[in-house]
Amino acid sequence: MSTTRIAAHRGAAGGNIHCNTWVAFEAALAQGADIIELDVSRSADGELFVFHPGMEPAHLGIDTPLSRMEARGIRNLRYLNEDNTPTQLGISTLDEVFEQLKGRCQINLDKFPTCMADIARAVRRHGMTQQVLVKTEAREELFRQVEELAPDLPYMVFARREDTVSEMLRKRFPNYRGTEAIFPDETCGVAQPEYTERMHRLGLQVWVNAIVFDCRRMLAAGHNDDISVAGQPDQGWGWLMDLGADIIQTDWPGMLRAYMNRRETEGRKP
């Protein structure tokens, strides 16, 4: 059985079901996702919502950032669907999503550094410290913030091209889990099988991204969702699995799960 886990990028969206909504999270779990990745925004009066900062014009049709709105106004907003038509789906609070997903899957809380203390308090309030995963860039000032505000949360760092910090961080943070490896081409240090093998020897994990949010920015040297769903999954998801990735983030969790199952049935490298 494949040991690679599937992280659903903002859930599984499509049609009238918008990303980062409770329905998208249910759809992702039904399609076989192991991890739900979601984004966190904070209102002007301090409430945490599940929404990608900066996407207000595209997803809601408004120009005002949620960070400048009060919570009661945010609750009245509705997502737009793929045809730019309002849906019935509002913006969930982080508290609501925590209760929805508690005990069901791991949750990657993206945008963690933007409101680190508030997010960490919410995680503890729901008793979910070992169910979440948080990440930061690999910078000393952020390491110090995590030490102060969230030392009890499972933690990863972004490794862009190379990883120069994991051996230090595993000694510094008891809850250090590994890296989100980002590599625009196959020559990068984190794009080598030797890197994932070394991480595994250290008891650490490597997260990679098959998602494409900008075709001009390669997150995994072109081994992505686009080529996978277009008929070349061996060059996309399969390449990442052969790299030894522990977690693949995708916008197509159902298709990736089906591909993993097919590989296993065919007796290929898990």
Regions found by a protein language model. Name each.
Residues 1-270:
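Phosphate-group recognition and catalysis centered on beta-loop-alpha active-site segments
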